[in-house]
Design a protein with these regions (language model features):
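Flexible C-terminal active-site loop/helix
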Residues: 75-114
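Glycine-rich phosphate-binding active-site loops on the catalytic face of alpha/beta enzymes
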Residues: 15-28, 70-90
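Alpha-helix-loop-beta-strand connector modules within alpha/beta enzyme cores
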Residues: 32-53, 95-110
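Active-site capping/gating regions of soluble enzymes
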Residues: 19, 45-50, 55, 64-75
Length: 114
């Protein structure tokens, strides 16, 4: 969906997922985060099983905005995933946990724990 009216009409059908296209909404001058917030609040209030799938997320700022607004999940630009996996903190965290594992369990791996 790309407009608030589409979003609320679609929600009336109680779909499994509703996909507000965040980037397109914002490009049309709509506050995409507010639409997601209204959808999430309505779903909660009506106790619906519908999940908000924020679609076409282009950067980490948008990702944080849609999750803060109440999105249950999101579709991401592959470039965003690649960038996130190349953050310097990730290899550091992997080394930290790898070192902690080896200190506690030696060279045994999770696949050895059957």
């Amino acid at each position: 969906v790309v407009t608030p009216v589409q979003a609320m009409l679609a929600l009336e059908l109680e779909p499994d997922f509703i996909a507000p296209y965040y980037t397109q909404m914002c490009g049309l001058g709509t506050d995409g985060a507010e639409v997601i917030r209204l959808l999430a609040e309505t779903i909660e209030r009506k106790k619906l099983r519908t999940r908000v799938l924020a679609a076409n997320i282009q950067d980490t700022d948008q990702l944080w905005q849609v999750y803060r607004a109440g999105a249950h999940c999101a579709t991401l630009n592959p470039r965003l995933v690649e960038q996130a996996l190349q953050e310097p903190a990730i290899p550091q965290a992997v080394r930290f946990f790898d070192d902690a594992w080896k200190e506690a369990f030696g060279e045994i791996s999770l696949t050895d724990c059957r």
